[in-house]
């Protein structure tokens, strides 16, 4: 670049910083915040699948899945982990269904948890925006997008049609929220439900509620599914769960994690430690016996899990070794984040192009009908 152009650029950058504040424009290579702060999901396998050791602060996250798949349980686990780090969390309960006893059983400090049970979707998202703008709240959870009912729908008659009202509400709210989320470094988690698209012959008929805006604005999207029942004898004591990282702008996407959710207790951390320890040769398995550092820790998985519960120091040591082995180093992670963001931008551009083509096709069909 010539000296004159460099001087003009420096002058423009200086003017932008004076007018809009320091950090309003910078060179991407100078930005060291790509090594993003994160909070654990409560599942070691999922933390590893996410690539940065958990869910990222300063981003929008969407967790979706069928009913009773563990969506709210996972967000409560995130709150419990964040509170251990001294973070402030808020729960916007649009479904009016949060159980404080269950939350406490999962390790949530209910005395410190902020909770709101709004009457309308507009109120819920306005509360969410105010909490984010305060800069004093680290995690805001909205449960769920499907329950964010627009005011016009609540005040209207039961049979009234309100086409696209919720999608417009979400689109407007996310436009307001995203810049504030980045500035305040707040994580905003939206829980979402699944619906079926009518008349889909090929491809996946499933979709999430609230339109397409959340899909584009989310840095991380998690698809959580119940894959089976966990039994002790004839009694069902929990779920086998699979989580797929459908979208990830901070690390490579499409990784999966499998873990167990125990009723009344949450994610089985000890079960994951044993499974991952065996997989990566840190825990030895000979027949039914499990050994760690040459010492037998139990016969059968259930007894080995109990041993780790009774010996938290050994469990923490094993977890530390697994995290050190499987989580990428900061320099590598910075490169991965850039690559992941480029890939996510391409995917978003493809999705937008498809949506534009569909709209254009529908418009042409309408024109043909009107001409005929």
From Swiss-Prot:
It is found in: Cytoplasm. ATP binds at residues 65-72. Disulfide bonds: none annotated. Keywords: ATP-binding, Cytoplasm, DNA damage, DNA recombination, DNA repair, DNA-binding, Nucleotide-binding, SOS response. It holds the Pfam family RecA. SUPFAM superfamilies: P-loop containing nucleoside triphosphate hydrolases, RecA protein, C-terminal domain. One of its GO terms (molecular function) is single-stranded DNA binding. GO terms for biological process: DNA recombination; DNA repair; SOS response. Can catalyze the hydrolysis of ATP in the presence of single-stranded DNA, the ATP-dependent uptake of single-stranded DNA by duplex DNA, and the ATP-dependent hybridization of homologous single-stranded DNAs. It interacts with LexA causing its activation and leading to its autocatalytic cleavage. This is Protein RecA. It comes from Idiomarina loihiensis (strain ATCC BAA-735 / DSM 15497 / L2-TR). The lineage of its organism: Bacteria, Pseudomonadati, Pseudomonadota, Gammaproteobacteria, Alteromonadales. The gene is recA.
């Amino acid at each position: 670049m010539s000296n004159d152009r460099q001087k003009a650029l420096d002058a423009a950058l200086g003017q932008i910083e004076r007018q809009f504040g320091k950090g309003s424009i910078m060179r991407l290579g100078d930005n060291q915040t790509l090594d993003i702060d994160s909070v654990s999901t409560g599942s070691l396998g999922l933390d590893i699948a996410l690539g940065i050791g958990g869910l990222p602060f300063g981003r929008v996250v969407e967790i979706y899945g069928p009913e009773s798949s563990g969506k709210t349980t996972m967000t409560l686990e995130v709150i419990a982990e964040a509170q251990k780090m001294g973070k402030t969390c808020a729960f916007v309960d649009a479904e009016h269904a949060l159980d404080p006893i269950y939350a406490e059983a999962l390790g949530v400090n209910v005395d410190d948890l902020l909770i709101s049970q709004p009457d309308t979707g507009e109120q819920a998202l306005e509360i969410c925006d105010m909490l984010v703008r305060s800069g004093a709240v680290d995690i805001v959870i909205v449960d769920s997008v499907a329950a964010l009912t627009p005011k016009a729908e609540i005040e209207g008659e039961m049979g009234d049609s309100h086409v696209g009202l919720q999608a417009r509400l979400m689109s407007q709210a996310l436009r307001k929220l995203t810049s504030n989320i980045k500035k305040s470094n707040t994580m905003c988690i939206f829980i979402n439900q699944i619906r079926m698209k009518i008349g889909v012959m090929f491809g996946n008929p499933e979709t999430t509620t609230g339109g397409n805006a959340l899909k584009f604005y989310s840095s991380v999207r998690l698809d959580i599914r119940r894959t089976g029942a966990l039994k002790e004898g004839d009694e069902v004591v929990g779920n086998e769960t699979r989580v797929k990282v459908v979208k990830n702008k901070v690390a490579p996407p499409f990784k999966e994690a499998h873990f167990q959710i125990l009723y009344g207790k949450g994610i089985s951390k000890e079960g994951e430690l044993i499974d991952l320890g065996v997989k990566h040769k840190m825990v030895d398995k000979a027949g039914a016996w499990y050994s760690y550092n040459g010492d037998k820790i139990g016969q059968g998985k259930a007894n080995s899990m109990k041993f780790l519960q009774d010996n938290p120091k050994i469990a923490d040591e094993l977890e530390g070794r697994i995290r050190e082995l499987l989580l990428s180093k900061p320099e590598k992670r910075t490169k991965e984040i850039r690559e992941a963001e480029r890939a996510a931008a391409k995917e978003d551009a493809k999705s937008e192009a498809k949506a534009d083509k569909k709209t254009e096709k529908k418009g042409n069909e309408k024109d043909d009908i009107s001409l005929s």
